[in-house]
Amino acid sequence: TRGGAYDVSGTGYQPEGDITLEGKTARLAQHGHLHALIEVVAVANDTHVAEEDGQWKVTGEPTEGALRTLSHKAGFDAETHERHASIPFESANKFMATLNTAPGGQRRILLKGAPDRLLDRCRQELGAAGELEPLDRAFWEAHIDALSAEGLRVLAAAAREVSASKDALALEDLEEDMVFLGLIGIIDPPR
């Protein structure tokens, strides 16, 4: 995020580990950038992670399971967001989108997927101080390249507020005016 590069410890789907920024534990309440990013990857997610017979298992896509585990480590409860509509992941689009109402009543479109596809749909980004700024595509592309060079699978997150009366979601709703929130690099284990 523009708020910094967070590190996440732990392995597998077990929700144990820390989220840190510059070596210090990062709590969602004090890190709005992190909260916004985790909200997207947790809520726009149809995979479940649960403990069965002492083992943490994923029901759904492994990458989505890693994102769900991240949200558990952060203490984020995706169940508090009511989903109204969704556009499932398709390989042609390379993203997933949902229309949700947050606990505070804000209705948002949440979008996660391939960074290049999301960058194409954003004109603004969440700035370092939490304000909206013009999208700096070169900045994000450099970070995408750096994460990819480390062998990580890179995903991006974006969102935007919509009218409280909006109850449907179409591809046209994602064409532009999304706000870019940041990137996530995931260790992609060999298959």
Listing of model-derived features with the role each one plays in the protein:
Residues T1-R191:
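Conserved cytosolic headpiece of P-type ATPases
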